[in-house]
Amino acid sequence: MHMSEIMEMLIRRGFLWQSFEIYGGMAGFIDYAPLGNNLRRKIENIWRKYFVINERAAEIDTPTIGIEEVFIASGHATSFTDVAIECENCGRVYRADHYVKEKLGIEVDETVEAVKEVMEVYDLKCECGGRFKDPAPMNLMFSTTIGPGKGKKGYLRPETAQGMFVDFKRLANFFREKLPFGVAQIGRAYRNEISPRQGVIRLREFNQAELEFFVHPGEKKHPHFSLYAKDVVKLVDKFDSQHEITLEEAVEKGIIANQILAYFIGKTRRFLLEIGIKDEKLRFRQHKDVERAHYATDCWDAEVLTSYGWIEVVGIADRTNYDLKRHSKFSGEDLSVFVPYEEPVKVKRRKIVPILSKLGPEFRQKAKKVAEALEALNVEADLDEVEVEVDGEKVKVTKEFFEIQEVEEEVTGEKVIPHVIEPSFGLDRITYSVLEHAFDKDVVDGEERRVLRLKRWVSPIEVAVLPLLSREPFESKGMEIVQMLREEGIFTDYDDSGSIGRRYRRFDEIGTPFCVTVDHQTFEDETVTIRDRDTTAQVRVKLGELPSILKELLRSEKDITEFGEVFRQV
């Protein structure tokens, strides 16, 4: 099976189209055609079932444009880069590690130094024969201006996550500061890829589904881990060692850093299998230290084997509290939560007691804020002076303005900045992978048949109603059945063009699991046939029972033979 054969079918049948096609198109952009859009929406809704409803998470929707301060704080303004190489002759720009792998067949670390060394050793040249300039980092964010004139600098978001971190104070209040809690978002993100060459695999505008699961830094166990603990998963660790092991064992042996990461690996695997990813073509690979994102301490990718090779479709990262700490520092807001102890405890501590009679004359209108900043400090030893921050300004305070006392206090809890475990899903790659894994060919009645063996619950068109003959009363009866099924919430299409066999093949190719045929017997006894896409078997059922039978079939993997005797295969 070649990717060009699959893409030809997806374009021709209305799953994916090239964006801006009448103007020649542009790499890195695709349009979801009617069938592809419906498929992706169904995948999104199953994702919601797993990661919003079952996790009791809150789903929010934040702007796709962010102000510059957000991305300075997050680190994207300086760290969200790929190494690029530009040809001195033709001016083409390539992503360095991809170009090296394509031309030399070797992996190279994504650093300027490593790329430069490979270029020199192998005398790497452009496809036009020209020489490259020295490699340089390129930021992948799209910049924009917010407002008229010079306006305010902003960026198209490179991930949905930052909107959830920026809203953390409100979200913590929404959850009454009770950890753990999850926040989800589905939406568009943007990355100005240097040289996107892999169709739907590397896009400049793409769809993400992300969950930020906020936890106590010292409590990385999940109360429902037992649901997935015995699941056997295929793992490739950061040393390239392969394991086929239960998640429980992987945590015990230290292969996976903590139970919550393992829990979401298990949940992700179940989700991918439910939407149609094949288990034998699914693995989880741990990031090597050199490739791990700047914010992560551990990260596992769900990778799917396709005609492009192994591609990452999900990243599951322990981001610690990097993001919240950064946004707290740059915004000046307290992004901690108060975690109460089961029982109050008494602790001795050294505290700074400001001498207010001296602070006033010295610091005047700032005296109150200086005093509050002093009282908030934790001290371990006697100090001659301390430095506090007041209104963004560093202020030095010598020991004549304060005393250090040892006090015993009753403490009812502690303030912590939560850690976050993040499963991040690339919906476009997932949608394409589902389609490729479903693509199949077989022989029926001596002819080759193309069929998308999609899971019934993700098929963009669930049922097709086909009149045996393209004339009355078959057509009007067919449309009557279509209306009945649509009112029951079943995605139903109607087709009376061409032979019945040709129509079956058309719906097989787009993955429609069931075809309902109106034939001569329909008018004799109010029955119709249901044809199964995968087996081509047909059974006859009563028209009045059709909606309930189809609903039961569409939400399960039941065989149609449970509802009638097979009398024909075509």
Swiss-Prot record:
Protein's UniProt keywords contain Coiled coil: no
Main function: Catalyzes the attachment of glycine to tRNA(Gly).
Similarity section: Belongs to the class-II aminoacyl-tRNA synthetase family.
Entry keyword annotation includes Nucleotide-binding: yes
EC annotation from Swiss-Prot or TrEMBL: 6.1.1.14
A GO CC term attached to the entry: cytoplasm
Stored InterPro entries: aa-tRNA-synt_IIb, aa-tRNA-synth_II, aa-tRNA-synth_II/BPL/LPL, Anticodon-bd, Anticodon-bd_dom_sf, Gly-tRNA_synthase/POLG2, Gly_tRNA_ligase_arc, GlyRS-like_core
Binding site for ATP: 191-193, 201-206, 312-313, 426-429
The protein, known as: Glycine--tRNA ligase
Places the protein is found: Cytoplasm
EC supergroup of this enzyme: ligase
Binding site for substrate: R95, E159, F206, N207, Q208, A209, E210, E422, P423, S424, F425, G426
Primary location class: cytoplasm
NCBIfam families: glyS_dimeric, PRK04173.1
GO BP terms: glycyl-tRNA aminoacylation
Organism encoding this protein: Archaeoglobus fulgidus (strain ATCC 49558 / DSM 4304 / JCM 9628 / NBRC 100126 / VC-16)
A Pfam match: tRNA-synt_2b
Catalytic activity: tRNA(Gly) + glycine + ATP = glycyl-tRNA(Gly) + AMP + diphosphate
GO MF annotation: an example: ATP binding
Protein keywords: Aminoacyl-tRNA synthetase, ATP-binding, Cytoplasm, Ligase, Nucleotide-binding, Protein biosynthesis
